[in-house]
Amino acid sequence: MTTRQPIYKSLYFQVIVAIVIGILLGHFYPETGVALKPLGDGFIKLIKMVIAPIIFCTVVSGIAGMQSMKSVGKTGGYALLYFEIVSTVALLIGLIVVNVVQPGAGMHIDVATLDASKVAAYVTAGKDQSIVGFILNVIPNTIVGAFANGDILQVLMFSVIFGFALHRLGAYGKPVLDFIDRFAHVMFNIINMIMKLAPIGALGAMAFTIGAYGVGSLVQLGQLMICFYITCLLFVLVVLGGICRAHGFSVIKLIRYIREELLIVLGTSSSESALPRMLIKMERLGAKKSVVGLVIPTGYSFNLDGTSIYLTMAAVFIAQATDTHMDITHQITLLLVLLLSSKGAAGVTGSGFIVLAATLSAVGHLPVAGLALILGIDRFMSEARALTNLVGNAVATIVVAKWVKELDTDKLQSELASGGTGISETREIDDLGVAEGPAPVVK
């Protein structure tokens, strides 16, 4: 029997309180808020420290433990198909909404008056991104380099190859697989220790955001922000909600189940901060480890629904604000470019904003200097992007697992019905098969 823990001990309550305190500190004591930035940065760095080994262990254990290698290719193929369809829908929705609402209309901004120097670094980084460059970048120069740099796609590629190789060894490779499983348990224990610091990280990150940019900076471009937030909400409830209903579960129950991860993302504005816990929770929802290990990390580059909505809305908003005419041909061109450029969003520093700069440079018709318009509020829009991305990847994992018949639907329904109440760190580790005491000797 699971005992419900007091609310003040729950992570989501602590993070909520931390976010509120951070907002108040940043608003009333902005200098103090800015000074707390290292708290948020430090927490995210702690999470990033263990992401690479956790992805490696999860993917290798999942692939090496599978009966047939054909199922790996099948899972990857279905995942990419899902990513392409849903992210395209997200791009289209952003394009439609920004054309209907027209948040930038009437601003009549003269491009010549904008300070292009503020966005020069983003434009330079954006120009460095190309399709061929992105594909080649997936291949690490060295194995150590992939882990040292924490590049998710590079680590994922090596992990898949390692998993295949380990599977081919059969019984001879079992000691290696056993070691990797035990190492994974150590990593997840480290994550549980780090997550105790989540409220502190959320407080520091939120205090810095409000202290550095101020609530007042939201007013000038508030219409775009409101439009974007509402669009993301509707996308989650209508599009993702419809996908969930078609596959026999509720997106509302799923959101409730991952509420702690969502609050961590809200506080830190980094969806990466929730990646390790998402691997645990998706597996506990009934998806096989092999599916979770492939879909979640890959989704961080190829299934960024919130970023897709942001990219089309921001690009057309700049055109509207600067009175740059965009006919249907220009908008179709923009959409086609974004279908490619958006897939590398998580692989570059600065994520969506740099991809937006790369897109404007590639399209050519839109003024790149217009990026200065949204530079000030981009930080405030990153929360909605990250939250939508996280929910989108959670839905994708369950759907793909069901498509490839690697989902325990009874477990899914029972876990969602529980709402994640009473989940403790001990239970998380127990679900991974770790017992108290010394590890048994492998003979």
Swiss-Prot record:
It is found in: Cell inner membrane. Responsible for the transport of dicarboxylates such as succinate, fumarate, and malate from the periplasm across the membrane. The gene is dctA. GO terms for cellular component: plasma membrane. It comes from Pseudomonas fluorescens (strain SBW25). This is C4-dicarboxylate transport protein. The chain crosses the membrane at residues 10-30, 46-66, 78-98, 143-163, 199-219, 224-244, 291-311, 332-352, 354-374. One of its GO terms (molecular function) is succinate transmembrane transporter activity. InterPro entries: C4_dicarb_transport, Na-dicarboxylate_symporter, Na-dicarboxylate_symporter_CS, Na:dicarbo_symporter_sf. PANTHER family: AEROBIC C4-DICARBOXYLATE TRANSPORT PROTEIN, PROTON/GLUTAMATE-ASPARTATE SYMPORTER. The keyword Cell inner membrane applies. Its main location: membrane. It holds the Pfam family SDF. It comes from the Bacteria.
